[in-house]
């Protein structure tokens, strides 16, 4: 996975986006987990779970807080309160 500020993603060797999560600032020191994508051919392999865990680790490492607006993130965090 490639980590950029406010984004984690993976591409295939041709540069096609395979998976992505974005978490831009919505306020000072608060990011919005607003988008999660996994290529249809790769769904069901828990890639989105990995992305959100990586994003949460990055967010915590920066000392930021977060709000989820992405439907997947909202559901995932509700199912994993111990990781939120």
Give names to the regions the model predicted.
Residues 6-8, 13, 20-30:
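A conserved beta-strand-loop-helix scaffold within acyl/acetyltransferase catalytic domains
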């Amino acid at each position: 996975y490639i980590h950029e500020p406010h984004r984690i993603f993976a591409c295939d060797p041709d540069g096609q986006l395979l998976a992505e999560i974005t978490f831009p600032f919505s306020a000072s020191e608060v990011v919005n987990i607003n988008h999660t994508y996994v290529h249809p051919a790769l769904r069901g392999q828990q890639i989105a779970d990995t992305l959100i865990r990586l994003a949460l680790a990055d967010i915590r490492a920066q000392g930021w807080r977060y709000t989820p607006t992405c439907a997947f993130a909202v559901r995932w965090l509700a199912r994993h309160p111990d990781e939120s």
